């Protein structure tokens, strides 16, 4: 009987260790649609991280440009990611994203610490992160599709 308990105990330890390792994976919480977003799911891609707020008029006019950029980046190992400056969560985040007609992923948790992004008090602000996770550019103010495409192309050296 003692041998059987040891086997069960070892199995429990292995399961607990696996659960702990899984729980340690960095998580950005659910996006505006309730889908979990992990840091691992974003690794190895170029990221265009845009901070926006409902009270920011230039943010509102910039969103269609970012929606268009997200569409052009499909199948290119690059994504547009939004972050609400006011840290809205859950239904509030969904309502705000819907009111702006945001079609790209909006994170519930700020990725600033993971990517070492400086806090900006001016909006909109957009960061371009390379596929190694390094900040390559900080862009202040309203961006255009053409401007972002040109900047990404130049940074990639294409």
Role assignments for model-derived ranges:
Residues 46-47, 78, 124:
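Alpha/beta-hydrolase fold active-site loops
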Residues 28-47, 115:
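A short beta-strand-turn-helix
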Residues 61-100, 110-115:
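Structural microenvironment flanking redox-active thiols in thiol-disulfide oxidoreductases
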Residues 40-60:
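Short active-site neighborhood of thiol/selenol oxidoreductases, capturing the structured segment around
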């Amino acid at each position: 009987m003692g041998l059987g308990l040891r086997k069960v105990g070892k199995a429990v330890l292995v399961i607990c260790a696996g659960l702990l390792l899984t729980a340690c994976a960095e998580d950005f919480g659910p996006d505006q649609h309730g889908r979990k977003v992990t840091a691992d799911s974003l690794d190895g891609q170029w990221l265009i991280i845009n901070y926006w707020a409902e009270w920011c008029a230039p943010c509102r006019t910039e969103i269609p440009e970012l929606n268009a950029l997200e569409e052009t980046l499909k199948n290119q190992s690059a994504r547009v990611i939004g972050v609400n400056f006011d840290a809205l969560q859950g239904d509030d985040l969904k309502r705000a994203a819907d009111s702006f007609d945001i079609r790209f992923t909006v994170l519930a948790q700020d990725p600033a610490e993971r990517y070492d992004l400086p806090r900006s008090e001016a909006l909109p602000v957009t960061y371009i992160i390379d596929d190694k996770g390094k900040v390559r550019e900080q862009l202040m103010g309203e961006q255009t599709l053409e401007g972002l495409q040109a900047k990404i192309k130049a940074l990639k050296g294409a």
